[in-house]
């Protein structure tokens, strides 16, 4: 059996190896960037006591860039290398459509990062003296509310705009997301 300390060091190294320059994380080596990976990194690192400013540096900006024009959250956002817009990194658009599962993971990550970043500057914040990008939580709330189906649909939730309701979104788009969104609105 591997001692806990050795396991934690190896886990930290592995998580850090998945980190991308824009603060996002890939799901596995050679894999895609996904906000769910950021959520998993936060959960694992906090549970193991290995969450450091270096690990979360840039993550809040990445999560906020996943917000779509609708107010919901997509799986990822273009990086500066993928989207050359001549502007600041903040202008990188989201990659994909807003989705209930992604929104839940992104909001839970954002709330956690708001709490962690309160008085804990990350390395890039120390260098640039800028505050992390904010998510438009009011817009996210409007999008989340619009995902509830009509009475004829049983009042259930859909995961994406103009899609059918689905039972799994009772958690992602219903109880889980609204609880996290409410907490984030109170923290901000």
Where are these regions (language model features)?
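An alpha-helical repeat/solenoid feature that recognizes helix-turn-helix modules
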Residues: 1-2, 26-54, 69, 74-139, ...
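Core helices of alpha-solenoid repeat scaffolds
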Residues: 4, 8-12, 56-60, 133, ...
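Asp-box/WD-like beta-propeller blade repeats and closely related beta-sheet repeat scaffolds
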Residues: 5-36
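Amphipathic alpha-helical segments within extended alpha-helical solenoids and repeat-rich scaffolds
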Residues: 13-19, 63-72, 137-152
């Amino acid at each position: 059996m591997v001692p806990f300390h050795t396991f934690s060091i190896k886990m930290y190294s592995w998580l850090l190896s998945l980190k991308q320059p824009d603060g996002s994380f890939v799901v596995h080596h050679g894999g895609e960037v996904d906000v769910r990976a950021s959520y998993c990194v936060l959960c694992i690192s906090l549970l193991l006591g290995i969450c450091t400013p270096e690990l979360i540096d840039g993550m809040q900006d990445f999560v906020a860039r996943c917000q779509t024009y609708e107010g919901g959250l997509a799986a990822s956002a273009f990086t500066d290398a993928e989207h050359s817009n001549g502007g600041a990194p903040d202008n990188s658009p989201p990659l994909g459509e807003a989705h209930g599962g992604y929104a839940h993971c992104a909001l839970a990550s954002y709330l956690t990062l708001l709490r962690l970043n309160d008085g804990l500057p990350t390395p890039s914040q120390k260098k640039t003296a800028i505050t992390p990008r904010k998510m438009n939580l009011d817009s996210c709330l409007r999008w989340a509310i619009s995902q509830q189906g009509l009475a004829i649909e049983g009042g259930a939730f859909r995961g994406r705009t103009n899609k059918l309701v689905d039972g799994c979104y009772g958690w992602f788009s219903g109880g889980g997301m609204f609880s996290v969104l409410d907490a984030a609105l109170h923290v901000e």
